[in-house]
Amino acid sequence: MRCLPVFVILLLLIASAPSVDAQLKTKDDVPLASFHDNAKGTQHKRIINWCCLVFYQCC
């Protein structure tokens, strides 16, 4: 009998959880991976620019 309240609470939590398809994708949605790729590219450009300013030989 002690497990019954826990079981009921879990059922309520599962039922109220948002589903994966809660929001439909639009044409403006961008995958998160592209943001990470852009950040890595920007960071790489900054490192190269800094290297060129400091050492002059890596350009």
Curated annotation (Swiss-Prot):
Subcellular location(s) per record: Secreted
In terms of InterPro entries, this protein maps to: T-conotoxin
Propeptide intervals in chain numbering: 23-44
Q: What is its main location?
A: secreted
Q: Does the keyword Cell wall biogenesis/degradation apply?
A: no
What does the UniProt keyword field contain? Cleavage on pair of basic residues, Disulfide bond, Secreted, Signal, Toxin
**Gene Ontology cellular component terms for the protein in this record:** extracellular region
Q: Which GO terms describe its molecular function?
A: toxin activity
UniProt keyword Signal, yes or no: yes
Query: Pfam families of this UniProt entry?
Result: Chi-conotoxin
- Where is the signal peptide, in residue numbers? 1-22
Q: Mind telling me how this protein is modified after translation?
A: Contains 2 disulfide bonds that can be either 'C1-C3, C2-C4' or 'C1-C4, C2-C3', since these disulfide connectivities have been observed for conotoxins with cysteine framework V (for examples, see AC P0DQQ7 and AC P81755).
Q: Of which family is this protein a member?
A: Belongs to the conotoxin T superfamily.
Q: What is known of its domains?
A: The cysteine framework is V (CC-CC).
Q: What's the protein name?
A: Conotoxin Sr5.4
